[in-house]
């Protein structure tokens, strides 16, 4: 299965029981910042934005004072799981990032998708990739 298939079929799909509710954008990005696969709507990010995200996984709390930036959009960092999940909020939407052994799984959402639904979609794929040694 290609990485693009993971994005298309496991991130950018209608959320169970909520037809038409899906993430706004999603991607799988290597720890080095290389994009493995992404939705057409995933923002173009800067290397320093990815560096900040990776630093926060290694030093939890790093992004809290400045916020999480991705593609020029600033998200307020909210409670995640230190070293495993970063969550951010911006207005009625937000972002969830799950770290696996080799990659970061990104999900970006807007209403009517809820933070919990985004977390479920992103973390389920991230946990699967971890189980596969990825």
Swiss-Prot record:
Transmembrane region(s): none
Cellular component GO terms held in the UniProt record: cell cortex; cytoskeleton
Primary localisation category: cytoplasm
Ranges spanned by the short sequence motif Involved in PIP2 interaction, renumbered to the chain: 84-100
Domain of life, source organism: Eukaryota
Localization per Swiss-Prot or TrEMBL: Cytoplasm, Cytoskeleton
InterPro entries in alphabetical order: PFN, PFN_euk, PFN_sf, Profilin_CS
Molecular functions per Gene Ontology: actin monomer binding
One Pfam entry name: Profilin
Modified-residue entries (Phosphothreonine), positions: 114
Family according to the record: Belongs to the profilin family.
Purpose: Binds to actin and affects the structure of the cytoskeleton. At high concentrations, profilin prevents the polymerization of actin, whereas it enhances it at low concentrations.
Oligomeric form and interacting partners: Occurs in many kinds of cells as a complex with monomeric actin in a 1:1 ratio.
Extra information: The variability of the residues taking part of IgE-binding epitopes might be responsible of the difference in cross-reactivity among olive pollen cultivars, and between distantly related pollen species, leading to a variable range of allergy reactions among atopic patients.
Name listed for the protein in its UniProt record: Profilin-4
Organism: Olea europaea (Common olive)
């Amino acid at each position: 299965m290609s990485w693009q298939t993971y994005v298309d079929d496991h991130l950018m799909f209608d959320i169970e029981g909520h037809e038409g509710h899906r993430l706004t954008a999603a991607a799988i990005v290597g720890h080095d910042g290389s994009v493995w696969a992404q939705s057409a709507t995933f923002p173009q990010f800067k290397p320093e934005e990815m560096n900040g995200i990776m630093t926060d996984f290694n030093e939890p709390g790093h992004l809290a004072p400045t916020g999480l930036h991705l593609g020029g959009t600033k998200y307020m960092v909210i409670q995640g799981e230190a070293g495993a999940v970063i969550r951010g909020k911006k207005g009625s939407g937000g972002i969830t990032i799950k770290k696996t052994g080799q990659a970061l799984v990104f999900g970006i959402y807007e209403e009517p998708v809820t933070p919990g639904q985004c977390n479920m979609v992103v973390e389920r794929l991230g946990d699967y990739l971890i189980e596969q040694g990825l």
